């Protein structure tokens, strides 16, 4: 079994590196003739190798310097899951009718692939096309979260007492008495490491509460000492009791006190922190769709990492991103990745098709047909 997993990881790595280096012949070699892609915007399409080359070469024509590092890659059986950030400048050709803006793009994907005979046979791309459009400058971006006075003071305390070397970060933010430093910046010379440091302020000083580092070459493959079945059971309970059952008491039993959420799967993004932050994040969705449920989900797990592709359904009863309720049922999909620490969820990278939700609430918005 391990030989198959290593063969599959080699094929998947070649597949991604082929995108990074415009090596379309390698794509043709590692993609199965009947390759099927499930994409949040384009639906399901049997592309085969040539179709996949077309999808990726179109994207590279629009963002010539775009690339995917691979911070996390796990495998189980004939399935494999990757955390796949996207970086690049929109300086090339128009992309799906959007003229190039020169903007720097940073957004995340969580992808699950199925391999057959050492070739990529099926792929589920998890990404938020709205985030892609916002990064391209084709849709308005929400304003960044404003720090309160205590949070600003704690960031300043971090800069004065912890970051004495004056290091740069992808993101430096605070939630109450907690400071979160994510880095290094992706333009740094050695961007193969992704580090999350969480500090807690007590009595005027900052103490390190937790620290986690991924290398992107080779990618993190899950902690071999962690029990895969325990990790899977914790995530299953999150889906069954919290996402389906709307039970926030259960969340307190299965989430770390320092749980961190990256809502568009971007490693440098830190939008929700702690059990209260996660509860607030979930309640935003439940206010818009009070009967929101997960209709179906599938997991891939290795060590302390679990990836899940899922389909959600709910009735529009409240505002969603300024769009009024319609009373209609909305359906959407996503792929998420979870890191487990001490039997609790410590980190979530989430992708969901926000643009698809918006286009169902207001068809004039249009779903678009992106295939990256």
Task: Please give the residue ranges for each predicted region.
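C-terminal and inter-domain tail/linker signature
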Residues: 1-372
């Amino acid at each position: 079994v391990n030989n198959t997993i290593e063969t599959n990881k080699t094929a998947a790595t070649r597949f991604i590196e082929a995108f990074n280096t415009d090596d379309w012949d390698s794509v043709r070699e590692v993609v199965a003739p009947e390759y099927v892609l499930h994409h949040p915007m384009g639906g399901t399409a049997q592309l085969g190798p040539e179709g996949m080359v077309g999808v990726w070469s179109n994207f590279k024509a629009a963002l010539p310097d775009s690339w995917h590092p691979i911070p996390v890659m796990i495998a189980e059986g004939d399935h494999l899951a990757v955390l796949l950030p996207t970086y690049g400048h929109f300086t090339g050709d128009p992309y799906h009718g959007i003229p190039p803006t020169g903007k720097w793009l940073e957004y995340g994907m969580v992808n699950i692939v199925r391999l057959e005979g050492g070739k990529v046979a099926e792929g589920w791309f998890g990404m938020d096309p709205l985030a892609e459009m916002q990064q391209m400058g084709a849709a308005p971006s929400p304003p960044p979260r404003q720090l309160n006075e205590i949070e600003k003071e704690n960031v300043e305390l971090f800069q004065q007492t912890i970051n004495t070397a004056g290091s740069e970060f992808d993101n430096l933010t605070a939630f109450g008495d907690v400071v979160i430093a994510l880095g290094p910046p992706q333009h740094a010379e050695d961007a193969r490491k992704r580090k999350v440091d969480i500090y807690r302020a007590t009595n005027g000083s900052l103490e390190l509460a937790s620290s986690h580092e991924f290398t992107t070459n080779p990618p993190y493959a899950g902690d071999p000492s962690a029990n895969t079945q325990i990790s899977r059971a914790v995530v299953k309970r999150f889906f069954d009791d919290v996402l389906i059952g709307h039970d926030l008491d259960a969340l307190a039993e299965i989430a770390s006190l320092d749980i961190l959420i990256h809502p568009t799967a971007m490693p440098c993004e830190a939008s929700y922190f702690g059990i209260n932050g996660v509860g607030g994040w979930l309640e935003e969705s439940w206010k818009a769709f009070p009967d929101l449920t997960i209709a179906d989900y599938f997991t891939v797990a290795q060590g302390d990492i679990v990836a899940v592709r899922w389909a959600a359904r709910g009735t529009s009863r409240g505002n969603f991103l300024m769009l009024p309720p319609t009373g209609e049922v909305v359906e959407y999909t996503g792929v998420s990745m979870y890191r487990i620490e001490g039997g609790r969820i410590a980190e979530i990278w989430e992708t969901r098709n926000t643009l698809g939700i918006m286009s169902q609430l207001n068809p004039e918005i249009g779903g678009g047909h992106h295939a990256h």
